[in-house]
């Protein structure tokens, strides 16, 4: 089965944004509105073949997008040419995560989200459990101004690590990572190389 034949979770755009009454551009972090959109996704999500979903802007694919923080630093990575998503090669990114799959027996969308998020982090990174302090929801990301963004909605969270914690990338031929201070991420030479979602995140990071 090819990557595009994978069954992933989607939700109709009309439901997610209540026929555009909840639409936003960029990062949205107002709790009540975020909760409302998440409830809309929970009520309407279903499975779809990934190849079809990628070409159909009538549906939004919810994507966990986890930023790894350590004090005033964020873990930044570059997608190398050996990686999968050709539309994002040589871009810098702060977010880990990916398409969500249905979880049999999950009690809620929150549980489906947590299990998919845990799996993605486990696949991509080596982080000691005792170094993890908390995972905090920061909001939602939407970017309807490019073809990739049109079919996705990001569920943004931050994984806080203890001072001195180490992060190891597992897929070294696909991504190269390093720690960087938030102030450095805001400088043009780095900021302009970030994928759009990561630029949105930097804009709200202190």
Curated annotation (Swiss-Prot):
SUPFAM superfamilies listed in its UniProt record: Nudix (SSF55811)
Secretion signal, residue range per the UniProt entry: none
InterPro entries: NUDIX_hydrolase-like_dom_sf (IPR015797)
Induction of expression: Part of the probable nrdI(ymaA)-nrdE-nrdF-ymaB operon. Expression is constitutive but low, dramatically induced by thymidine starvation which requires recA.
Knockout consequences: Essential, at least the last 3 genes of the locus cannot be deleted; could be due to polar effects on downstream ymaB.
Designated name of the protein: Protein YmaB
Organism encoding this protein: Bacillus subtilis (strain 168)
Lineage: Bacteria, Bacillati, Bacillota, Bacilli, Bacillales
Gene name of this polypeptide: ymaB
